[in-house]
């Protein structure tokens, strides 16, 4: 069996070890040795983009925010779905992840970060959401395991009522937010509904051949009365 190659690593703000690995042509991100995502299981990341940016609701010059760059699969799909006048902001907490995408992952998705539609913000996606009302047509959030299981405790504020209200205000009327979740979160779904979103819970497989949809994507549509 071919060994895992440790390509690069860094430390998160709380001191955890975050690393990029390659094995038999596939790439993986790990936190303290535990796999967070891999290029062999990207179905749910692509679905996240499909649900946030449905082609039938395409706008001429959409502004999209992606929370979490990861291996770049959600970004690639958003660029495929939006037109040439789109502005796609990517908020990534770790500058090293941005650098790894440029240095190691070009063979996966191409030079995504060189696309003129892409704007990279190195920092917390919460700061992007806080900067203005009715700013985004779509928001994709894949920054943690979901509303209750956190790798980074500070991400909890995105899923609490105040955070959800802030997301609602940052969307344009008719805008969508899509949250990736490792599992079902009915309490969070209710929280989105209380904030005024029309909510869909969408099952998501980790990979094409999976027998069941282990993950969930929660899609909130901003409806204005």
Regions found by a protein language model. Give the residues of each.
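Short amphipathic beta-strand/extended segments with alternating polar/hydrophobic composition
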Residues: 36-42
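The AdoMet/dcAdoMet-binding core of the Class I SAM-like
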Residues: 42, 46-171, 179-182, 190, ...
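N-terminal auxiliary segments of SAM/dcSAM-dependent transferases
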Residues: 1-30
């Amino acid at each position: 069996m071919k060994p895992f190659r440790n390509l690069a690593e860094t430390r998160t703000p709380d001191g955890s070890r975050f690393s990029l690995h390659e094995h038999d042509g596939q790439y993986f991100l790990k936190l303290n040795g535990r796999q967070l995502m891999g290029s062999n299981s990207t179905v749910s990341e692509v679905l996240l983009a499909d649900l946030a940016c449905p082609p039938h609701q395409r706008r001429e010059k959409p502004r999209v925010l992606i929370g979490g760059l990861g291996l770049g699969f959600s970004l690639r799909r958003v660029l495929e779905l939006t037109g040439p006048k789109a502005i796609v902001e990517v908020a990534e907490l770790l500058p090293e992840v941005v650098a790894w995408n440029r240095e190691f992952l070009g063979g996966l998705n191409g030079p995504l970060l060189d696309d003129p539609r892409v704007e990279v913000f190195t920092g917390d996606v919460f700061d992007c959401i806080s900067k203005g009302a009715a700013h985004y047509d779509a928001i994709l959030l894949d920054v943690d395991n979901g509303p209750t299981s956190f790798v980074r405790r500070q991400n909890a504020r995105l899923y609490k009522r105040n955070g959800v209200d802030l997301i609602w205000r940052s969307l344009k009327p008719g805008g969508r937010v899509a949250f990736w979740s490792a599992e079902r979160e009915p309490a969070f779904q209710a929280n989105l509904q209380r904030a005024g979103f029309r909510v869909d819970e969408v099952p998501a497989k980790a990979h094409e051949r999976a027998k069941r949809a282990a993950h969930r994507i929660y899609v909130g549509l901003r409806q204005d009365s």
